[in-house]
Amino acid sequence: MTETSTIKVHLMRHGEVHNPERIVYGRLPGYRLSDKGQQMVRLSAEEFAARAERGARFVHLVCSPLQRTRESAAPVEELLGLTAQPDERVIEADNYFEGLHVNAQELRRNPRHWMKLYNPARPSWGESYLDQIRRMAAAVQDAARTAYERGGEGAEAIIVSHQLPIWITRLGVEGRMLQHDPRARECNLASITTLAFSTTDFEHEMPNSFETLFLWNLQVAIWLD
């Protein structure tokens, strides 16, 4: 695919969160970016702006509705002149441990947690990987279509989301095992993961190649688990 015959969707992770108690904040409200987090997302926004100066056409911006992702989208709005559209489909994964300070000692001394740890392949402590991929796939495909409708060939969209949904999306696209070590995720704070699609995917009224690719690769990943 050439640059002009593709639609790109960039998945940007939010910046560092102010969380001195080291709580699993998940979808809890009220968790803002730290000062360092603000600097992180500013640098990411400046990278998008630099690409725009070199000819990239960013025409659509989506963000998770949580405070940290809205704040992360703000400098992108400022530098690219876009308005972020909140989308529940790119929100953080649901997690049983929300609101807790989780460590090995906490898990060992509280048997009530044990039943949530029996199946890391699903995972049993939160939203399933399958559900995450389905909602993210739909959101990414809609963002790509909107970018194409607004900007035609070569247009680009940005989605500001969270580490696990972004990483699971990448694993699904690449057909890799969904069960993984969280320490091995290649999705740092304020990082950018880019997906590219051929514009031929959007020449029909109801393109479904992306969703089909996602679900096919997901099945491969499940079989390999």
Task: Report the location of each language-model feature.
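Active-site catalytic microenvironments for nucleophilic, acid-base chemistry
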Residues: 47, 75-79, 142, 146, ...
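Glycine-rich phosphate-binding loop signature in dinucleotide/nucleotide-binding domains
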Residues: 51-57, 143-155
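Phosphate-handling substructures
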Residues: 77-138, 224
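Active-site-proximal alpha-helix that buttresses catalytic centers in soluble enzyme cores
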Residues: 7-83, 133
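Generic beta-sheet signal
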Residues: 9, 59, 152-163
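Active-site metal-binding loops of divalent metal-dependent hydrolases
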Residues: 15, 163-164
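Short coil-to-beta-strand
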Residues: 5-16, 106-114
